[in-house]
Amino acid sequence: MKILYYDCFCGISGDMNLAALIDLGVPKEYLMEELSKVNLNSEYEMKIERSVKLGITGTRVDVKLNESSHGEEEHGHDHYHHHRKLKDIEKIINSSHLSDKVKNISLGMFMKIAEAEAKIHGKSLCEVHFHEVGAIDSIVDLVGAAICIDYLKVDRIIASPVQVGGGFVECSHGIIPVPAPATTEILKNIPISTGIVQFETTTPTGAAILAVNVEEFTSKIDFSIEKIGYGIGHRDLEIPNVLRVYLGEQERSEKVEEQYILETNIDDMNPEFYEYVQERLFEVGALDVFKTPIYMKKGRPGINLSVLISEKGEKDVLDVIFEETTSIGVRKHKVEKIMLNRDFSKVKTEYGDITVKKSYYKGKLVKYKPEYEECKAIAKEKNISIDKIYKVVYRQDLN
């Protein structure tokens, strides 16, 4: 499995991301050729060069605008404030000759920033005027990111917790705290760290690249590193102003996720309540809920309630446990969940199309299962046994 890993020890910005991925191996000629399909070549020039920050050698990207009036992005290159709206950005991308995949990735990142800006300024998506995103160089940053990600053809993208910096920064709205409100909104439910330097180390553009493309945020590296790229930032800081990226190979074909188990022992709750509690836990994002009969002190029978969650699901699950059960304490365990690769397909039967889930181990199909809820609904509608529907699905696929 091919892995792209972002090591954001000094945050991430759009230009540093482009520089790091070029340094990793994306040919600059390929990037420039693809960017030319956006039909904005006359509005900017891209300078790509080798650079050094505190002894670390990497690639630096600088986008210079062919405009007389310039602003400045806090982390990197210049910005000219066109004040474009989302529909303008969408028109530019959709009218380009980029591949559909690159278009979709690009539009996803722009939408992420648009939603954040709309919420911060209390406006609808169609009303938002982009300052950072409306600038040509930010279009280059985000479309360029999509081009590079598509070129690398990785199976998974992972990132470390994101350093966002600290202090205050001046923008078109005045002096605002770091991380900027838009950056904070984009990075919701993503692990961050702050204050390593008094500077904006992560910009909204960089945050959107991570929020849209990264599947997992973890400091753990469980793959062999094959290539390393360094994207050099423009500002001199106390630490290396560098974005480091790894291209690696994970030997196991199974997907591994870090998850958590929250568990509590209960011996004084009405057992009728467990069904409701379980429903509420799933509603707030629990990945799994299970109950184990136990004997507690003084021989009292009880239940061990266990809830499997992702890192970002803890708060809502704890709210349900403490508000809906008699528990006054919860234990938390970090676990690794190893999952087989899987896909879904439709099987045509005499009762209609039914979804089946296929699971693979070491590249071989090892599990094949119809979706229970679909089979149950058909069984009720047709007044036939669910076992018969399962057999029809298996027989149809064998044929």
Swiss-Prot record:
**Presence of the UniProt keyword Lyase in the record:** yes
What Enzyme Commission number(s) appear in the record? 4.99.1.12
> Could you tell me which Gene3D superfamilies the record lists for this protein?
mk0293 like domain, Transcriptional regulatory protein pf0864 domain like
Q: Name one GO molecular function term.
A: nickel cation binding
User: What is catalyzed by this enzyme?
Assistant: Ni(II)-pyridinium-3,5-bisthiocarboxylate mononucleotide = pyridinium-3,5-bisthiocarboxylate mononucleotide + Ni(2+)
What keyword terms does UniProt attach to this protein?
A: Lyase, Nickel
For this chain, the family text in UniProt reads: Belongs to the LarC family.
- Kindly give the PANTHER family that the UniProt entry links to this protein: NICKEL INSERTION PROTEIN-RELATED, PYRIDINIUM-3,5-BISTHIOCARBOXYLIC ACID MONONUCLEOTIDE NICKEL INSERTION PROTEIN
User: What is the name of the protein in this document?
Assistant: Pyridinium-3,5-bisthiocarboxylic acid mononucleotide nickel insertion protein
